[in-house]
């Protein structure tokens, strides 16, 4: 059942039970209140309503929200009581629940994988731990979290939101479809696809392989479409993924404050695009956030002509318990692993020299130490 169908059914049911007319728009508002939102517009801005596999749980706060919203819409106390008694069971009967899109995106960004067969979602192939945490209701209690398999209904809800210009919905779909770099296409699938395109009639496993290749093409096209749409609508995460996957420089051209991005990842992507200025900028952000390896690289590759700047990185690293001026050498095996005396065998040396910098005057040194201290305090 779609949300539109549910709203119509609920409207008919409540009118029959109360003898009072309900506006269809009010049903949507009451549905939103049942999930803890002040309005249906607020719900749609960050969540997807969909039909799951089990009834969602509602907290006492949700019940209060429903009572409040019903009264705000101008219904009599008798009608409010009927709505309170009748609407939650209707929602439970139809197994309606919500997924918060930002939370869904957060899970997918950490555990995204190649999804074979979209939109026919195969929940059994998805990691159980993610299933147990990814779908939930707006509840203030951990045991009220609603758990459900990722489903065609959820994807349909995301697509509907995407059609209405929701950049986060576009991005969530793109993450569903993001190709896994470790995914290996079945050997021969491209060959059999080419044969079928040439008019050969395939059967059995050859047909399965050709269909698998078609599906991978479709997934890749949908992935790029939704990613580009999310980027076009201003989603910075999507723009960064576009830079990584399609060498699209839009992320860097529009500028970003970097608060929500891993600066080392951004620096790596910038370097792959040959944007050296941006590499410097984002390594600096990483260093200012406390990454000592970024500090070392800045000293060696970017800030080497500014001795005071280099010393500020050295002193900042020291405040973070890292001495960049100390040589760091260690024994390894031939394969590069750290040397194990119990294993024995030939011993090799690996490592790197400590940073060597020209000395500063006392005044310069005091100024640089204060700069490092200020940067350190900003991290706290």
For the regions a language model picked out, list residue spans one by one.
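Charged linear interaction tracts used for macromolecular binding and regulation
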Residues: 76-187
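Helix-turn-helix repeat elements of alpha-solenoid scaffolds
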Residues: 127-135, 142-153, 184-204, 212-221, ...
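Alpha-solenoid helical repeat scaffolds
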Residues: 159, 228, 243, 284, ...
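Acidic, serine/threonine- and proline-enriched intrinsically disordered linkers and terminal tails
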Residues: 182-219, 324-355
């Amino acid at each position: 059942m779609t949300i539109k169908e549910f709203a119509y059914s609920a409207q008919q049911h409540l009118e029959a039970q109360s003898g009072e007319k309900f506006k269809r728009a009010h049903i949507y508002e009451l549905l939103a209140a049942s999930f803890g939102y002040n309005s249906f517009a607020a719900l749609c801005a960050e969540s997807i309503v969909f039909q799951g596999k089990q009834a969602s749980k509602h907290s006492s706060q949700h019940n209060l929200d429903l009572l409040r919203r019903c009264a705000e819409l101008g219904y009599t106390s008798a009608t409010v009581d009927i709505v309170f008694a009748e609407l939650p069971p209707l929602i439970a009967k139809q197994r309606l629940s919500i997924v918060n899109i930002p939370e869904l995106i957060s899970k997918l960004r950490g555990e995204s994988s190649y999804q074979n067969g979209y939109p026919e979602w195969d929940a059994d192939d998805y990691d159980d731990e993610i299933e147990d945490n990814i779908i939930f209701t707006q509840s203030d209690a951990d045991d009220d979290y609603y758990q459900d398999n990722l489903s065609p209904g959820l994807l349909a809800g995301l697509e509907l939101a995407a059609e209405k210009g929701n950049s986060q919905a576009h991005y969530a779909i793109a993450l569903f479809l993001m190709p896994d770099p470790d995914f290996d296409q079945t050997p021969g699938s491209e060959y059999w696809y080419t044969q079928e395109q040439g008019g050969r009639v395939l059967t059995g496993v050859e047909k399965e392989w050709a269909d698998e290749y078609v599906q991978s093409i479709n997934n890749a096209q949908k992935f790029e479409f939704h990613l580009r749409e999310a980027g076009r609508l201003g989603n910075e995460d999507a723009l960064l993924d576009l830079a990584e996957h399609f060498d699209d420089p839009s992320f860097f051209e529009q500028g970003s404050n970097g608060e929500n991005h891993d600066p080392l990842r951004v620096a790596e992507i910038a370097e792959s695009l040959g944007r050296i200025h941006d590499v410097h900028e984002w390594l600096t952000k990483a260093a200012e956030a406390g990454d000592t390896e970024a500090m070392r690289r800045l000293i060696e590759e970017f800030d080497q002509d500014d001795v005071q700047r280099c010393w500020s990185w050295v002193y900042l690293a020291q405040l973070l318990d890292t001495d960049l001026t100390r040589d760091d050498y260690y024994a390894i095996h031939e394969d590069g692993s750290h040397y194990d005396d119990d294993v024995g065998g030939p011993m090799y040396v690996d490592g790197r020299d400590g940073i060597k910098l020209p000395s500063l005057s006392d005044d310069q040194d005091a100024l640089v130490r204060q700069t490092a201290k200020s940067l350190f305090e900003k991290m706290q």
